[in-house]
Amino acid sequence: MSGAAFSRQRGQLLSDTLAAAKAEGRSALIAYLPAGFPTVDGGIAAIKAVFDGGADVVEVGLPHSDPVLDGPVIQTADDIALRGGVRIADVMRTVREAHEATGKPVLVMTYWNPIDRYGVERFTAELAEAGGAGCILPDLPVQESALWREHAEKHGLATVFVVAPSSKDARLAEITAAGSGFVYAASLMGVTGTRASVGEQAQDLVRRTRATTDLPVCVGLGVSNATQAAEVAGFADGVIVGSAFVKLMLDAEDEAAGLEAVRALAGELAKGVRGGD
């Protein structure tokens, strides 16, 4: 089977997974973990653990030396991964092994600069061959995304763009028209990290975004427990959780304890997106 044909199944798997959650009357649980943290093997084990706990989709972060949109927790994890020598090849391996072990959709979340340096065709081809479902590109402007989208579509990869409360309605329509898979709605202005409340802005942003697209709208940036997950699940198609998982691994006594902690949190959040059932 060709890489492109293989990946089209993976891109469809993402859409099917989100649709299946909706058919069950719930939001999807989407987890974020950086590749190479605490090690490449440890990162793969952590992804398997959150899938075991009940995550529907995982975003694999490509560690960056200047993650300007990420808070201190993810910055710390990225720094550990980079000091460990993580490379794009390790990210691809993480995607491949996580997907092959679970059969679940796995995306990459990355800033644009590493892809630009690596080569768009090379990156998309390798991600497709690894079984990746697509890519989340938080800092790639839609008006500069034509080359990426050409190659992503060629390889059957979803392109997920990020919208924010500051986005005007016309801008939302432009962003959602260019994207695929789902829309990532940033629930609070600023960088990622757990917060006491995900904020009322999130619900309004989801409403405004849905007015422009039939794509699922998934909310991230702030959710860290089942109560918040249930709150967001009441109005969003997916609940994205990252910093809370990473913090548990940073705070754990050892890797085994970290794996158990993220598995347990995924289970708690999975109950949250199901309304506590």
UniProtKB/Swiss-Prot annotation:
The alpha subunit is responsible for the aldol cleavage of indoleglycerol phosphate to indole and glyceraldehyde 3-phosphate. Transmembrane segments: none annotated. Disulfide bonds: none annotated. InterPro entries: Aldolase_TIM, RibuloseP-bd_barrel, Trp_synthase_alpha_AS, Trp_synthase_suA. CDD domains: Tryptophan_synthase_alpha. Its EC number is 4.2.1.20. It is an enzyme of class 4 (lyase). The active site is at E59 (proton acceptor), D70 (proton acceptor). This is Tryptophan synthase alpha chain. Keywords: Amino-acid biosynthesis, Aromatic amino acid biosynthesis, Lyase, Tryptophan biosynthesis. PROSITE patterns: TRP_SYNTHASE_ALPHA. It comes from the Bacteria. Gene3D superfamilies: Aldolase class I. It comes from Streptomyces avermitilis (strain ATCC 31267 / DSM 46492 / JCM 5070 / NBRC 14893 / NCIMB 12804 / NRRL 8165 / MA-4680). The keyword Amino-acid biosynthesis applies. The gene is trpA. GO terms for molecular function: tryptophan synthase activity. Tetramer of two alpha and two beta chains. The keyword Zinc does not apply.
